[in-house]
């Protein structure tokens, strides 16, 4: 299956997925992007590694921006800390020349993806049920890191 066909399939799957299914797909995309970035790093394809790493970072940032602190403040706060930590770890791992750390970071997302799969299975959206209202997608913003943790040299 070509890239465009696979992309179209994923877009169509996301369009018809339940809200929980969309979260599962987001985690799958993060894991896939980090694994691909790791393979690219191992092959010395640093531009591809950077593109895949940026893709993972964008998805993590989007998930964080969509957290609803009013509905579930405890869970939202914990996920926010997790996402912030993972963004930092992704950037740190991306600075390395091998894919080992990127693979390790991708492994942190697997238990969350699997937990959301259980939620999706145990509490499916009934057929024909209206989707919950979508919150507007916030614009992606640069990631803020403490000054002592900023990577000053991004050369591969």
Language model regions located:
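Solenoid-repeat scaffolds in large eukaryotic assemblies
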Residues: 49, 56, 101-105
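Soluble N-terminal interaction domains of secretory/endomembrane membrane proteins
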Residues: 9-13, 29-32, 38-39, 58, ...
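Short, solvent-exposed, charged loop/turn and helix-capping segments
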Residues: 62-77
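Amphipathic, charged alpha-helical scaffolds that flank and support histidine-based chemistry
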Residues: 90-106
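Short terminal interaction segments
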Residues: 1-16, 106-156
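N-terminal first-folded block
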Residues: 16-48
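Amphipathic, well-ordered alpha-helical segments in soluble domains
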Residues: 26-33, 52-59, 82-85, 89, ...
């Amino acid at each position: 299956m070509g890239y465009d066909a696979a992309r179209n399939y994923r877009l169509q799957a996301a369009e018809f997925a339940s809200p929980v299914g969309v979260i599962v797909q987001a985690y799958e995309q993060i894991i896939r992007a980090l694994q691909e970035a790791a393979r690219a790093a191992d092959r010395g394809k640093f531009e591809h590694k950077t593109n895949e790493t940026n893709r993972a970072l964008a998805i993590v940032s989007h998930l964080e921006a969509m957290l609803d602190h009013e509905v579930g403040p405890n869970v939202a706060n914990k996920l926010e800390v997790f996402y912030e930590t993972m963004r930092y770890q992704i950037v740190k791992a991306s600075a390395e020349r091998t894919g080992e750390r990127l693979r390790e970071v991708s492994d942190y997302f697997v238990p969350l993806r699997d937990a959301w799969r259980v939620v999706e299975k145990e509490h499916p959206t009934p057929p024909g049920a209206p989707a919950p209202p979508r919150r507007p997608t916030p614009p992606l913003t640069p990631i803020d890191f403490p000054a002592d943790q900023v990577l000053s040299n991004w050369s591969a």
